[in-house]
């Protein structure tokens, strides 16, 4: 079971992932609220409550709906806020991690 790796402002290299945390908007970046962010591979028990959805859905199902085949899911980073899955590139940001106030936003970019 891979561990979470804490992320710091600026550029982060975690395995094959190159991740940037910044307060500057960027194309394809995930807009999230500030906090203790970390990254890890997806886990079977992960789920997200996407804004406007009718409740929590499994990440497995969300990835499948977006056409990510099972053999590629381990390559998808899961960004965690305070240890909980909160944002996934190509899927979205959990309602709990959406920025509460304009200007108080962190942008997570994957290269």
Q: What do these predicted regions represent?
A:
Residues 1-111:
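AMP-forming adenylation/ATP pyrophosphatase catalytic core
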């Amino acid at each position: 079971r891979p561990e979470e790796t804490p992320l710091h402002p600026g550029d982060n290299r975690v395995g094959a992932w190159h991740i940037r945390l910044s307060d500057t908007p960027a194309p394809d970046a995930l807009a999230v609220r500030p906090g203790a962010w970390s990254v890890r591979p997806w886990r079977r028990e992960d789920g997200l409550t996407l804004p406007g959805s009718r409740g929590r859905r499994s990440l497995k199902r969300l990835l499948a709906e977006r056409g990510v085949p099972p053999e590629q899911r381990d390559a998808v980073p899961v960004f965690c806020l305070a240890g909980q899955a909160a944002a996934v590139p190509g899927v979205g940001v959990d309602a709990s991690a959406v920025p509460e106030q304009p200007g108080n936003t962190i942008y997570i970019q994957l290269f």
